[in-house]
UniProtKB/Swiss-Prot annotation:
The keyword Electron transport does not apply. Belongs to the bradykinin-related peptide family. The lineage of its organism: Eukaryota, Metazoa, Chordata, Craniata, Vertebrata. GO terms for biological process: defense response; vasodilation. This is Des-Arg9-[Ala1,Thr6]-bradykinin.
Length: 8
């Protein structure tokens, strides 16, 4: 995942 990506 790219930096700053936060899955929920």
């Amino acid at each position: 995942a790219p930096p700053g990506f936060t899955p929920f």
